[in-house]
């Protein structure tokens, strides 16, 4: 289970009563993102969880999940510009992170797109290729 690489503070952040409708979505997103590599990790900051290629604080970020509000989760992915699917949104105001190009907004009841695992792998590969 990749939850051992998910910052326990992130799980705690989405464990309050208001997060019940989105907690499993967050855990599922994290599973997709962390399963791209045995080295990938997720670290909570104040309002987002950054998914990195490895565990050092300075390691590249390939995805970010904003958990600012329990009404929605916004996930940004570092996809190559020519490979950003039409189903993803461009960078959203106030939710910018360097290198992220495609954004997915999930609210209670929304399904994670079937392609999300592929997008996560592509984002991870894209960031690793920048080194």
Label each residue range with its predicted role.
Residues 30-34, 121-124:
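Generic solvent-exposed, charged/amphipathic alpha-helical segments
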Residues 1-31:
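Charge-rich, low-complexity N-terminal segments
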């Amino acid at each position: 289970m990749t939850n051992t690489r998910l910052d326990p503070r992130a799980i705690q952040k989405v464990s309050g009563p208001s997060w019940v409708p989105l907690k499993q979505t967050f855990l599922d997103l994290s599973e997709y993102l962390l399963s791209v590599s045995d080295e990938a990790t997720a670290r909570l900051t104040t309002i987002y969880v950054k998914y990195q290629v490895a565990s050092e604080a300075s390691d590249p970020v390939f995805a970010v999940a904003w958990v600012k509000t329990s009404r929605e989760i916004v996930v940004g992915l570092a996809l190559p510009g020519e490979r950003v699917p039409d189903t993803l949104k461009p960078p959203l105001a106030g939710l910018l992170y360097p290198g992220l190009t495609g954004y997915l907004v999930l609210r209670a009841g929304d399904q994670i797109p079937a392609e999300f695992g592929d997008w996560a792998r592509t984002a991870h590969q894209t960031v690793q290729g920048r080194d």
